[in-house]
Amino acid sequence: MSGSSLRRVAVFGATGSIGASALDVIARHPERLRASVLSAGSKVDALLALCVQHRPAHAVIADAALYPTLRDGLHDAGLTTQAHAGDQALDALAASDACDTVVAAIVGAAGLSSTLAAAAAGKRLLLANKESLVLAGELLTRTAAAAGAEIIPIDSEHSAIFQCLRSCDASRGVRRVILTASGGPFRGRQRAQLAEVTPAQAVAHPKWSMGPKISVDSATLMNKGLEVIEAHHLFGLPGEQIDVLVHPQSLVHSLVEFVDGSTLAQLGLPDMRTTLAVGLAWPERVESGVGGLDLLQQGRLDFEAPDTGAFPCLRLAWDALRAGGTAPAILNAANEVAVSAFLQGKVGFLAIPALVEHTLTTLQRQNADTLNTLLFADAEARRTTERALAHHSLHA
């Protein structure tokens, strides 16, 4: 991108933590980046505040009942921003000339449709929505390839692999990729010690500032399991070439090992603004607001194997990847229901993997040929997990 061109960015999920980081980077470069579309699920007041600050051309609220509040709020603020509501409006804007880049940061399966719409329209897609790849990875990558869309991952691990692979013309010489995990707030605890974990403890991540659902996924290691499935789709690697290491300092974000024995790693402070700056400006580099890494001050880098006995969600993700078809969609849907129940205090922490495993073993995988097949599997998995919530033995 030349210095004189202006990249118009749609930030889907603008009121979340990733959206805030994206808007921080965009605001630092008004000469080359503009937030042209902002969306939120139901936080209409927060969306209005962002519109006042960033003055996008369009604002979308997913909850159609809040459309009058958004429309009137924009008018009262004296903004020319056009108000929209509902998923269809989001999809239409993703595919329109209102943007050339989409930050896909809507949490959960709700973000899939707009992500696919952006890919089908050939946009640069900064992908933070893990579920799009886990639920429909083959469909998304195929759609993007056909339309010439560019998928740039912005979670730290896949961004690290992206940067390592793009640093040289050696993608065919990859022996394996190694995703790093912080281990979450409960690293080192035995399984029995996890029974009394509370939602407040689970969302208190030691390194990253994230939303509640992703924080719980990090605590269970499901986040890393989903990233294994993502890496399979993003980089075209079989599961056997994707490993996981626990790295509590969260400074080495991932590594790529080549067949000649060389290993490249990407390091940096744990701040999403770095990876967002990579995606927004690639192949150029721009200031992100994140400081450099002082290895002398950090002192040490530690690595250890993940404990899949205490944290079985990582193993369940490997199982789903090996099974293929709709199994990853089933895994993801069951996990969303289980995590929601945990955050509401309905079940304990250990019930999350128990519920996911129950649904994975109960439902038969199908070939993931169409989006309808995947969405049906998603809905069926949610129903199965909801029914299992009433089963006392799963509430460990």
Swiss-Prot record:
GO terms for biological process: isopentenyl diphosphate biosynthetic process, methylerythritol 4-phosphate pathway involved in terpenoid biosynthetic process. 1-deoxy-D-xylulose 5-phosphate binds at K130, S156, E157, S182, H205, S218, N223, K224, E227. Mn(2+) binds at D155, E157, E227. One of its GO terms (molecular function) is manganese ion binding. The keyword Manganese applies. InterPro entries: DXP_reductoisomerase, DXP_reductoisomerase_C, DXP_reductoisomerase_N, DXPR_C, DXPR_C_sf, NAD(P)-bd_dom_sf. It catalyses: 2-C-methyl-D-erythritol 4-phosphate + NADP(+) = 1-deoxy-D-xylulose 5-phosphate + NADPH + H(+). Pathway: Isoprenoid biosynthesis; isopentenyl diphosphate biosynthesis via DXP pathway; isopentenyl diphosphate from 1-deoxy-D-xylulose 5-phosphate: step 1/6. Its cofactor is Mg(2+); Mn(2+). Belongs to the DXR family. This is 1-deoxy-D-xylulose 5-phosphate reductoisomerase. The gene is dxr.
